[in-house]
A protein has these predicted regions:
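C-terminal luminal/periplasmic domains and tails of membrane-associated envelope-modifying transferases
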Residues: 1-6, 10-11, 15-23, 27, ...
Length: 146
């Protein structure tokens, strides 16, 4: 929350929502009843995530894609936070970061990457942020489904 002062989407509420004045969209559904109802309805495309993101002006998603796939094909993978040591309080040792497009637009990565570089420089020893190859923006993200 120190580096991104805008709404964000997650699928595991936690530190990102602590003392955060900006909206946190919980795609898993614990903190968002609409997401909970959609997920309870069974398998869905990633379109519902894009719709909720648009409704809440979300431009950054930080998620465990294995938990919530398929990811909207319009979302651009910008990087991955690799946690140090054994995962204790989270289900996996990495968090994927996606640029989320505005309604009818393309995902904007320039400002986001600059802010993520500042964030990456602040990480403790052993924790790494790996940036995606943004020259491959047209390449489908690995968790995308039509």
């Amino acid at each position: 929350t120190e580096y991104w002062h805008a709404p964000v989407a997650v699928n595991d509420l936690g530190w990102v929502s602590f003392q955060n004045d900006d909206y946190v969209l919980d795609l898993y559904g614990l903190g968002n009843d609409e997401a909970r109802q959609i997920r309870a309805g069974g398998p869905a495309t990633g379109d519902w995530m894009q719709g909720l993101a648009e409704a809440h002006d979300v431009r950054l998603a930080m998620i465990f894609p294995e938990w919530i796939a398929p990811i909207p094909c319009s979302w651009v993978a910008v990087g991955e936070l690799q946690l140090a040591g054994q995962a204790v309080s989270v289900p996996v040792d990495h968090v994927s970061f996606y640029a989320v497009p505005a309604a009818g637009g393309a995902a904007e990565t320039g400002v986001m990457v600059a802010k993520l570089k500042a964030f990456a420089a602040s990480l403790p020893d052993g924790v790494q942020f790996r940036f995606a190859d943004l020259t491959q923006v047209n390449k489908r993200n690995a968790y995308c489904a039509d």
